[in-house]
A protein has these predicted regions:
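Alpha-helical scaffold domains
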Residues: 1-226
Length: 226
C-alpha cells in the first residue's frame, strides 16, 4: 500500500463504500475505499500543494475508485489551461464510471471558451463512453448561457450511441437546453431529431425540472413518442 493509499484509507467510511458501489454498477466492490465526496474534495485542495500530487497524476491506472475520484478533483484545480487539457486527455481513457466522469469540472475551462469548444467537439465524437459524456457535459456547463449559439446544439444531437451513460447525458443536456434556451432547443424535440429513447428521456427530465413552466411541460407531454 502506498503512503497516499494509507491516508485515503484513514478517511474510510465502509457503509459509504457499500452505498457508492450500488450507485456505480460495473465497478468491483473491492475498488471502493468509501470516502465521502466533501471529505475527498477538502483533501484534494490540500494535496495539490504537495510534491506527491504531480507524481500521483502520472501514475495511471489507479487501483481504487477513490483514487480516480481524487484524480478528477485534482484536475479540476489545475490553473494552467494547456496543462489541464493534457492531464484530462491522459486521464479520460481510464475513466470507467459516471461518478468519476462527472466529478471533473475544471475551473480554468471558463476562461478559455474558444479553445475549449474545439476539444469538446473532439471529446463528443469519441467512441469511449466517458470521454463522450465528459465532452457533452462540458458543453452543457459552459455554453448554454451567455456563450450560447444555436449551432452548438448540433454537437450532442449528432452523437450516435447505444451506451446508457452517453444517452443519459444527451437527454440531460437537452432538458437543460430547454430550460435555458427554449426557442432554439424545442425544434429538436418537435422535429424528432433525437433517437426515441433520448427524446422521451429529455421530455421526462424537462418535465421534472422546476425551470420549465407548467405551459411548457404541458406542451412537452404532447411531443412524447409513443
Amino acid at each position: 500500500m502506498t503512503s497516499l493509499q494509507e491516508r485515503l484509507f484513514a478517511m474510510q467510511d465502509k457503509q459509504y463504500a457499500a452505498f457508492q458501489a450500488k450507485l456505480t454498477p460495473g465497478v468491483p466492490i473491492e475498488s471502493f475505499i468509501g470516502i465521502r465526496v466533501p471529505v475527498l474534495r477538502k483533501f484534494a485542495k490540500e494535496f495539490t500543494k504537495e510534491t506527491e500530487c504531480e507524481e500521483f497524476l502520472h501514475q495511471l491506472p489507479h487501483e481504487y475508485y477513490d483514487e480516480n475520484m481524487l484524480h478528477g478533483l485534482l484536475i479540476s484545480e489545475v490553473k494552467d489551461y494547456e496543462e489541464c487539457i493534457r492531464l484530462t486527455d491522459r486521464f479520460l481513457p481510464f475513466v470507467d464510471n459516471w461518478a468519476v466522469c462527472d466529478i471533473m469540472s475544471p475551473k480554468v475551462f471558463a476562461k478559455h471558451k474558444e479553445e475549449l469548444l474545439a476539444k469538446i467537439k473532439t471529446w463528443s465524437k469519441s467512441s469511449h463512453v466517458y470521454t463522450c459524456r465528459f465532452g457533452i457535459e462540458a458543453l452543457m456547463s459552459h455554453y448554454l448561457d451567455k456563450d450560447f449559439k444555436a449551432e452548438y446544439l448540433e454537437i450532442p444531437a449528432s452523437v450516435r450511441s447505444e451506451e446508457y451513460y452517453v444517452k443519459m447525458m444527451v437527454a440531460w443536456f437537452f432538458a437543460t437546453a430547454l430550460a435555458k434556451q427554449w426557442d432554439q432547443a424545442i425544434p429538436y424535440i418537435e422535429q424528432n431529431r433525437l433517437a426515441s429513447w433520448m427524446h422521451n428521456k429529455t421530455i421526462q427530465k424537462a418535465i421534472e425540472s422546476y425551470r420549465i413552466t407548467p405551459e411548457q411541460k404541458e406542451y412537452l407531454r404532447t411531443l412524447k413518442i409513443k
